[in-house]
Amino acid sequence: GEDVEQHLRVRLGIDVAAVGLEHLLAQRLGLVLGGDGSVLRAADFVRGHNVPLLAVNLGHVGFLAESERTDLHRTVQAIASESYVVIERMALDVVVLVEGREVARTWALNEASVEKSHRERMLEVVVSVDNSPLTAFGCDGVVLATPTGSTAYAFSGGGPVVWPSVEALLCVPISAHALFTRPLVVGPRSTIGVDVLTRTRETGVLWCDGRRTVELPPQARIEVSRSAEPVRLARLNPTPFAERLVRKFRLPTDGWRGPVTAQERAGVLHAVETVEPRHAGPRPD
C-alpha cells in the first residue's frame, strides 16, 4: 500500500519501483507484504528459482509471515545485513488423470483439496495409498496437505497439527458420511490417490492452495506426492514451532484454574527429570 511505500522511501531511504519477473528471480530474497495468501501467490513465482521469501504480515493471522507491520524498519535492516536463515518447506506435486490419461499437473504448498462443485450432492470417492485402496466414502471433500498446510484448511477439517520438521502427507476427509473415517498421516515417499466414482454423477473441483482449480469429472483420479521442489522461506529469529502456534493462534496456556506460576512449572519439569525409566523385565507365568 501507499503507507508501506512511503515508509520505505522516507524513513528508510529505499527507492520503490515496479520491476519485471526476470528481475525478481535474479534477487537473493523476495519481501512479501501481506498475509498468507500473498505468500502463496509469491511462491508461484519463485518456486524452483532458489529465491527465499520473507513475509511481513499485513493481514490477519499471517501464519507464514515472519514479522508484523510494526517491525518493518527492523525487518528491512535485517534483510540489508543478511541477518536471516533460510528454511525449506515441503510442497506437493498434484496430477489429475481421467481414464488413465494425464489432463492436468500442478502443485501446492499448503494443500490440494478435492471438493464437490454442487452443494446438493456428495462426492463419492475412494482413497488409496501407494495404489492400494484404503477406504471409500461419500463426503463434501478431501484435503491432501503438507505439514505447512496442517494449520490451514486441514486444521479446520479436524486434521492434526504436524510440525514442519516432520516429513509427511496428510489426508483429511471433509464432512465424510461414514462412521470410521479419520484423518491419515502417511510417509513422505507415499502417493495418496483420490478416485471420484461414477456414482457421484456431478463434477468435482480440485483446488490447490485456494488458487489454482481443475474440474474433476466422474472417473477422475487425483494423485498427490512430495515435490522435489520445496518452497524456501527466510526466518529472522527462528523460534520453536510451539511458540509460533501459541502466538499466531493466541492459544490459552493457562488452565481454567488460572495462570500456571513459574514455581509450579519448575516443579513439573523437576518431576519429569527425576522419574527413573522403567525397564521391562520377564513377565510372570
Residue map of PLM features:
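N-terminal glycine-rich "phosphate-gripper" loop used for MgATP/nucleotide binding
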Residues: 32-36, 43-44
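Gly/Ser/Thr-rich active-site loops/lids in small-molecule metabolic enzymes
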Residues: 135-180
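Short Gly/Thr/Asp-enriched flexible loops that form oxyanion-binding sites at enzyme active sites
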Residues: 41-47, 154-158
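Short glycine-rich anion-binding loops that position phosphate/pyrophosphate groups of nucleotides
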Residues: 35-38, 61, 148-150
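Gly/Ser-rich helix-loop-strand patches that form or flank binding pockets
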Residues: 45-56
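ATP/nucleoside-binding phosphotransfer catalytic cores, i.e., glycine-rich phosphate-binding loops
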Residues: 114, 130-133, 182-285
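Catalytic core of DAGKc-family lipid kinases
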Residues: 61-141
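ATP/NTP phosphate-donor binding region
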Residues: 1-29, 33, 70-85, 96-106
